[in-house]
Amino acid sequence: MNLKVKTISNIGGEVKAPPSKSYSHRAVILASLADGTSKIHDMLFSQDVLSSINVCRALGANITKKDDYLEVIGTNGKLHNSSEVPIDLGNSGTTLRLMTSIASLADNEVILTGDDSLQTRPMEILTESLASLGVCAASINGNGKAPILIKPGYVGGETNILGNVSSQFISSILISAPLSENGVDLFVLPEFKSRPYVNMTCDIMAKFGVKIENEFFVRHDDCDRESKNCRIDEFKISKQEYKSCDYVVEGDYSSASYLLAAVAIYGGNAKILNLFKDSKQGDKLILNILKKMGAKIEIFDDYVEISSEGNLKGIDVDLSNAPDLLITVAILAALADGTTNITGVKHARVKETDRIATTCSELKKLGCKLKEFEDGMSIEGGIRSGVVDSHKDHRLAMAFSLVGLKHDIEIKNGEVFDVSFPNFIEAMSEIGVELELI
């Protein structure tokens, strides 16, 4: 189906940001590993998160959706694969990466697979790092990608992993580490990208009762301790158990970026609820980006207010710790005056699509002048109406719909927003943007 803007009324009002996808994944997974019954409130039930729920059920967790929370009766780390066929994770790269380590805790073999897109995601860096911990996880097709066969056994010990490919590899090892036989000492080699996502993992692990020691050192005595290229992070996780708890999922700054950007682009005033001032989410960076581009932002304990005249200016921005903002910022840049330089997002090339390449190719269809680089792009403001393709990437579909605030736009395969933001159309309507699928 194609997504387009139907009508626009005065932009503004009040809308609640959807629950965090990242925290929802982690909450159901940790609750499934915990001893006892957990209640997860404000859970996001998107396609990706449902993939995590389904695999946790297959491995032994008892998960029930109640009226206003998700009840999870945990396994206390004692997993058993009840599925007689490969477990299909759909398009959820987060689920695949997080569960590859965890599946080794089962007492029988597990095969994790997914759709065609998921089967293009590189997994070799994770499986090689796990091998040093006594985990046998291998690509069935021998290409380093899903389907992944994971055999029982997780000894633990010491390993290292590159920090510049996917923070989910790091989170995967961290989450599974307390349930290994001997604990884990993990070294993250520079450059450590998307660090806030790992901070989120450590944060929620603490909520479920697990302690992590984190320190860092530099490669050589004469290295600059502030240099990202010299710093090696060490995470020490002893053998422990997860404890059940009641957990409330906070709002998602990634998804809220589309609501905030809509107000910034068109002009207006809005209050976005459920966005927490002390959040560890890296995508909170969107607030600083919009400020620099010309919007007025006020941050309160649990909501954000934005006002804008609709006149934005180009900026320079490093998205190394917030790669999921790439497409939103690219659209803001295309609708702003001047030039915007986006850097630090080489790791966005291994998302649902090569997001640097697909964003650039679709912007060019709209007459945008830009230059593509290995780790980002330079965009000159100026864009026209047209038709683009989402490449079945949920973030591309939602971000490009923002073009419709200024120009006619139609996005092919636009229905894929269900992956992360099921009520995207309804939320946009609450601030005055009527979208339709045709």
Curated annotation (Swiss-Prot):
Phosphoenolpyruvate binds at K21, G93, R121, Q168, R355, R395. Pfam families: EPSP_synthase. GO terms for molecular function: 3-phosphoshikimate 1-carboxyvinyltransferase activity. The active site is at D324. It catalyses: 3-phosphoshikimate + phosphoenolpyruvate = 5-O-(1-carboxyvinyl)-3-phosphoshikimate + phosphate. CDD domains: EPSP_synthase. It comes from the Archaea. One of its GO terms (biological process) is aromatic amino acid family biosynthetic process. GO terms for cellular component: cytoplasm. 3-phosphoshikimate binds at K21, S22, R26, S166, S167, Q168, S194, D324, K351. Its main location: cytoplasm. InterPro entries: Enolpyruvate_Tfrase_dom, Enolpyruvate_Tfrase_sf, EPSP_synthase, EPSP_synthase_CS, RNA3'P_cycl/enolpyr_Trfase_a/b. Its EC number is 2.5.1.19. Keywords: Amino-acid biosynthesis, Aromatic amino acid biosynthesis, Cytoplasm, Transferase. Pathway: Metabolic intermediate biosynthesis; chorismate biosynthesis. It is found in: Cytoplasm. It is an enzyme of class 2 (transferase). NCBIfam families: aroA. Monomer. This is 3-phosphoshikimate 1-carboxyvinyltransferase. It comes from Methanobrevibacter smithii (strain ATCC 35061 / DSM 861 / OCM 144 / PS).
